[in-house]
């Protein structure tokens, strides 16, 4: 029988004493994790105690500082913490929207025709998701975010329908603040509480906007007033919110180079600073009232300066319904057509005559009430954002409008260039919000699908060009365009009861006539010759305008006849007809 060979005692001991390359777990842990020397153990213990003291002591010290600090310092600490949350939410929303659009356009819709039902359905769902995310984020963050969302509502000719319908929620949506915050602000600005400054003060806000909320109150002499109280933290968080939005817009531009809106935010910085100064708003209101005093149907609430500051504005209380509330207008026994006409004439007067232009005339800032004569009065609110258009730019704008109506392409190009724009035809269509090349609609045959699609999708197809046009404009003209487009949107919401194009052009006629009259004063010695020259130019302009309106109406009538006879697709012809009526 075979037996295994055994080593002698000497060699066996030598083999066992040799270190193994892979020791058993017990030996490994005993060898590597045995108790450290006393000096190392003492240092590690000190580090642990210091770390524990930092973790426990820092919150305690911050809490003690918070409770010992003044109210304004405590507010800044809260803002710092809340700012982290707003930043995180904003980045999350920006990444979600950018990624969603990238995935839909580059993966889901790769190879799909743009006008196919599948493409339209998927992009519509993508637009809706993005709009929902924007609204939810704006409401949650409040302040500046809501303000920018409201501004987007007026771009209903440029943004998809899903955005416009969803963003309208922000026109009346804002976070209200409690009475303690109102008291704190009054103590900081007036060293008195509201019930000391007013005979009555309702802490429940009657309206809330993106920058402030409005309270109803009564002065000691019995005058009913509206007190606009700015949210106390807006000035402190302004810089941080603007920087966050700049970062988001740059992030979106990296993924979508054609989406170049970061320059808009740069321009809005200065205007938002104006809106945060309620003393400036009061001065704007008084100037507006003075310049529009010949329009007896325009009402500007009187400012009470002894109860106003940079963050509080007290003015006469004026009741009324929103200018786009058709039912509210009719319930007062007023004519919608009269309201729309007065609205357009009021802001056309500012654009073409005074040059001092209300830049935020959204429906919440224009109320309608019945006047002493039984007809509509317009109450203009929120005068925080105004833009002054100097005589040079106003002259170029009037002459451009005149050239468009006279179909003078050379003059259109010249006056658009004076405003800094090279693509004069695209700018003219953006300015007029309707087709300038009306001749393209005429022909002995039916309107083609391509022409109808151009009318419907001009903004979408020329998005890059529109961005270049807007960037090239003088900055005052941006807010003028905002005014024009907001008024157009209100007129459209009222069912287009009046011809905005005709009223605006007619105002441009007289604005240009005044400028020409001033220019001819130094050329013609006789005032009679000067007036004859001005009247002749105005008459030519008036005739061209009426011929233009007639051509528009004949075009619309022809389209309807063709539809009735079955020679034109009803849906496409109706879209063009509606566009002509805008």
Swiss-Prot record:
Q: Does the keyword Flavoprotein apply?
A: no
InterPro entries from the xrefs? ABC1_dom, ADCK1_dom, Kinase-like_dom_sf, Mito_struct-func_regulator
Q: What does this protein do?
A: The function of this protein is not yet clear. It is not known if it has protein kinase activity and what type of substrate it would phosphorylate (Ser, Thr or Tyr).
Q: Whose protein is this, by species?
A: Mus musculus
Put simply, this protein is called Uncharacterized aarF domain-containing protein kinase 5
Checking CDD domains in the record gives:
ADCK1-like
Q: Which gene encodes it?
A: Adck5
TM region positions: 50-69
What Pfam families is this protein classified in?
A: ABC1
Source species taxonomy = Eukaryota, Metazoa, Chordata, Craniata, Vertebrata
Q: Which GO terms describe its cellular component?
A: membrane; mitochondrion
Compartment(s): Membrane
């Amino acid at each position: 029988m075979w037996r295994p060979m055994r080593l002698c005692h000497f060699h066996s001991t030598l083999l066992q004493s040799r270190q193994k390359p892979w020791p058993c777990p017990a030996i490994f842990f005993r060898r590597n994790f045995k108790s450290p020397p006393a000096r190392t153990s003492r240092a590690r213990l000190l580090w642990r105690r210091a770390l524990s003291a930092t973790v426990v002591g820092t919150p305690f010290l911050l809490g003690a500082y918070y409770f010992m600090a003044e109210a304004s310092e405590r507010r800044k600490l809260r803002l710092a913490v809340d700012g982290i949350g707003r930043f995180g939410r904003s980045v999350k929303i920006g990444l979600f929207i950018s990624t969603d659009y990238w995935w839909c356009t580059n993966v889901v819709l790769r190879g799909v025709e743009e006008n196919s039902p599948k493409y339209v359905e998927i992009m519509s769902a993508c637009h809706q998701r993005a709009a929902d995310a924007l609204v939810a984020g704006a409401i949650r963050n409040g302040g500046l975010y809501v303000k920018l969302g409201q501004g987007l509502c007026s771009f209903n000719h440029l943004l998809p329908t899903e955005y416009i319908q969803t963003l309208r929620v922000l026109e009346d949506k804002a976070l209200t603040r409690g009475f303690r915050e109102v008291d704190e602000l009054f103590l900081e600005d007036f060293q008195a509480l509201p019930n000391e400054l007013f005979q009555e003060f309702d802490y429940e806000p009657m309206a809330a906007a993106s920058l402030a909320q409005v309270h109803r109150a009564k002065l000691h002499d019995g005058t009913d007033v509206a007190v606009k109280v700015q949210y106390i933290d807006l000035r402190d968080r302004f810089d941080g919110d603007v920087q966050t939005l700049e970062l988001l817009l740059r992030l979106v531009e990296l993924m979508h180079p054609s989406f170049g809106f970061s320059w808009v935010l740069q321009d809005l910085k200065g205007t938002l600073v104006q809106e945060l100064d309620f003393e400036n708003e009061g001065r704007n209101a008084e100037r507006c009232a003075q310049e529009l005093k010949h329009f007896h149907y325009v009402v500007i609430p009187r400012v009470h300066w002894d109860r106003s500051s940079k963050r509080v504005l007290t003015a006469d209380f004026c009741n009324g319904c929103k200018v786009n509330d058709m039912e509210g207008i009719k319930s007062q026994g007023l004519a919608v057509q009269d309201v729309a006409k007065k609205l357009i004439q009021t802001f056309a007067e500012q654009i073409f005559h005074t040059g001092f232009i209300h830049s935020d005339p959204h429906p919440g800032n224009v109320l309608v009430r019945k006047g002493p004569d039984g007809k509509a009065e317009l109450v203009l609110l929120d005068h925080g954002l105004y833009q002054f258009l100097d005589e040079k730019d106003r002259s170029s704008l009037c002459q451009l409008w005149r050239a468009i109506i006279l179909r003078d392409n050379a003059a259109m190009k010249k006056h658009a260039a004076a405003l800094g724009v090279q693509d004069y035809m695209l700018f003219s269509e953006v300015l007029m919000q309707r087709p300038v090349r009306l001749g393209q609609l005429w022909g002995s045959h039916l309107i083609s699908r391509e022409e109808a699609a151009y009318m419907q999708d001009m903004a979408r197809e020329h998005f890059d060009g529109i961005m270049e046009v807007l960037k090239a404009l003088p900055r005052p003209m941006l807010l003028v365009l905002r005014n024009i487009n907001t008024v157009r949107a209100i007129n459209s919401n009222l069912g287009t009861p009046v011809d905005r194009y005709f009223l605006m052009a007619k105002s441009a006629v007289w604005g240009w006539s005044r400028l020409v009259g001033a220019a001819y004063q130094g050329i013609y010695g006789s005032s009679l010759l000067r007036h004859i020259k001005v009247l002749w130019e105005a008459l030519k302009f008036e005739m061209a305008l009426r011929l233009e309106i007639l051509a528009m109406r004949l075009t619309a009538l022809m389209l309807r006849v063709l539809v009735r006879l079955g020679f034109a697709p009803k849906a496409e012809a109706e879209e063009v007809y509606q566009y002509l009526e805008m």
